[in-house]
Amino acid sequence: SIDLLNTITDAAIVPDKMLLSIQDLTNFLDTIEPSLIILQNITFANAAYASEVLKRFSCPVLLWTLREPVIDGGRLRLNSLTGAYSAGNALAAFRDGNFEYIFGAPQEERTKKTISACIRAAWLKNELKNLRIASVGHTPQGFGFGRAMDADMQKVFGATLESIEVRELIDMAKGYTDDECSEYLDKMTKCTVGLDKTPDNNRKDFARLCKAYKEYVDENNIGALSSRCWPDFFTAFGTPVCGVLAMLNDMGVAASCEADT
């Protein structure tokens, strides 16, 4: 089992020995701060072990039951599966059934795929705790389905949601000169077919908007952004923000229109 984990990730922390008492378990738990717990019953164990883990940590849990080899000899098996029933009941009580489960030996491909998927998902969830999301303006009428609440984003993903008014970025854009924005205009010209047919003032305004958004993203460490577009950028600025959001996506910043967070 340990060899399998080490082939999947270099971040696995495992005990030096089997944890055969609650004291052994608590001593080990004192040394870790996990983003994912893989709880494996090597033999029969009651729910006290799983309960001790669950009351300490809120991270995702994968319950792993070993498929035991069949050996003729009349002896009882180690009952890993029996122990999983106890642990599963504790998980259902603590997490309302919200946990992952795999029944299989370390050599089975299905076991490896399930554990790999759980580790990747846990890594992503942990990374999202460092994500800052920006909502530029509010969703227009009819687009409320895309509106996000900061408390919900924090609760579900651990991400921080901040808001800024559209006019603030428009005012930033209006304050730039053509020379200050030439870099962004050059980039857009190279990657947009037919940009030369766009009115000159719209192309320059796009470059101003692109600079304003990029500087806001960089200064505030924004990893994802949604922006109101219609009608503000048409009426107050004269140029839509759609092209800017496309450029942000190309730069590695997830961006969407109509403040669809």
Region spans (language model):
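Active-site loop ensemble at the mouth of alpha/beta enzyme cores that anchors a bound cofactor
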Residues: 188, 231-261
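Hard-cation-handling environments
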Residues: 215-241
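Metallocofactor- and cofactor-centric catalytic cores in central/energy metabolism, strongly enriched
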Residues: 1-88, 96-125, 130-134, 139-224
